[in-house]
Amino acid sequence: MTVFADHDAYIAAAPEALQPLLAFVRARLAQTLPDAEEIIRYDMPGFGSAGLIIAGYAAFSKQCGLYVSKGAISAYSDDIAAAGLKASKTGVTFSPSKPIPDELIAALALASRKELGV
């Protein structure tokens, strides 16, 4: 298992086709959560505060995932479906051919932060 020192190392190790998408998600999360710190937890990059993970992201072989609180996914389930994306209890998967909308990244991150109370 590879241990990543930081977000840059994680993105650099991801499949080349996914790197721009990961960089975009990272930038949007950083903009949306300016007071959160960049963290690596469970071998994934994320943004956290007060020891909690507000939002994280990951790369797989052909797609990426954005991971937030269960309540955030529930609150935006219609928006996720309208974007043609698939959601689990705590995540949304997307690909370069069907990226996650900019405003959905922000909405999910803010809803997750609110639910966590940080």
Language-model-detected regions and their locations in the chain:
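Charge-dense, helix-prone N-terminal extensions
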Residues: M1-V118
